[in-house]
């Protein structure tokens, strides 16, 4: 059966019963129908919980993805089945990838979060609220320039873009304000996808409604004719934008097929944003659970690094254990096998591709945290391939455990769950890759590129070099950095698979996200508005006269 067929046959528990498992009363949730709810921001921590945090990340994936969310959900179910009270905390999907290449982002097989259709499509309206808030701010900025423009905002240096929750390459570069004096001031701008917006990052890093408003007020929208930054707070727009987002700030509660409480909230991409669900979602899960399992987008070089160097600084807690998801398919792909041949045994390609997994292991070990590798099982895997991965990981003093969450749900993930509990109780000495206060922006970027990606050197474009100087002048050197790069490679070139060395990492531009609290570095040709593939997932979706959807996988 397909994912959506499995989800359609599931018997869901009322969301009030799921809330009860977390000690939440009906007064502490706001129901969105029978099976979805938002959690009140003032929920108090339960004192008798262990508050253990498990981070699930992965190796560099194939274009189809490697089932990280599936393993995450299976692990959460397995822990509960073994009587370790657990909550899952994960990101909510963007409709761009849902209708583009992924077709859905709520796990797969018998490890899914439900109601699957609702979560993948409009859910509780968080992304719509973010889109509206973002574009309201854009409209306010354009109106300000058209009217008196008391702060002398330079229309050529407005960096705030509009957003849409779609993959629409035609909107990457646009001209607004055409049509004469009453239509505004003409200027070049563009659209980003909502998941890459600063407001998405702010929503995911805010710790309260007050913090949300403070962060929004710090957003830099552009520069004056004297090249001085102008913030939302200086324009006095922060309260209006906060009002639009006040409900979206509340975490969303749903369930897995096995009725594990799951908090799904916030959805920044890991390649063009920081790739982690909201701090409030993770903190709420930690407050109410013995174990919280959460994920970071794409590979450990992207979401993993950003969780540990960006989100952790706000959350104030590091993971007690890290799970790196690997597949035979992705390792063979990183070892040079063609996409069309990934269902065939290829031990030579697998051996070469192990360099990718080994680098991710060593990278996560730099943070001083215990690690286990989860081999996400595919039906095409052979015993020889599985054993090769286990043997190679053993040489790194890391255990690799076969999981079958897609076919068996939590029951296929018990061995991994037991290992995670063991690791979470082991001692660790967490450290960051860079010192956020001591290292300047350039040093931070170079440390990530060299220590995590394996680069020999970092090349900054002339534009990026000038921005480094200006950002230092503005006092932004003490912020974390968020590198936007391809998810398929350690380099900025998606064709360089495996574990390249002796390469130059290219940074072309810096983007200040002062409200979010970091500076984005755009590497290679990375774009913040994706496009659709040749055959979008949308063309294979159907809905009948009764509203039944097929093709959403």
From Swiss-Prot:
Keywords linked to the UniProt accession: ATP-binding, Ligase, Nucleotide-binding, One-carbon metabolism
GO terms, molecular function: ATP binding; formate-tetrahydrofolate ligase activity
Alphabetized Pfam families for the sequence: FTHFS (PF01268)
Entry's family note: Belongs to the formate--tetrahydrofolate ligase family.
Keyword Ligase set for record: yes
Pathway(s) this gene product operates in, as recorded in its UniProt entry: One-carbon metabolism; tetrahydrofolate interconversion
Protein name listed in UniProt: Formate--tetrahydrofolate ligase
Reaction catalysed by this enzyme: (6S)-5,6,7,8-tetrahydrofolate + formate + ATP = (6R)-10-formyltetrahydrofolate + ADP + phosphate
Binding residue positions for ATP: 62-69
UniProt GO BP: tetrahydrofolate interconversion
The EC number(s) this enzyme carries: 6.3.4.3
NCBIfam families xref list: PRK13505.1
HAMAP family: FTHFS
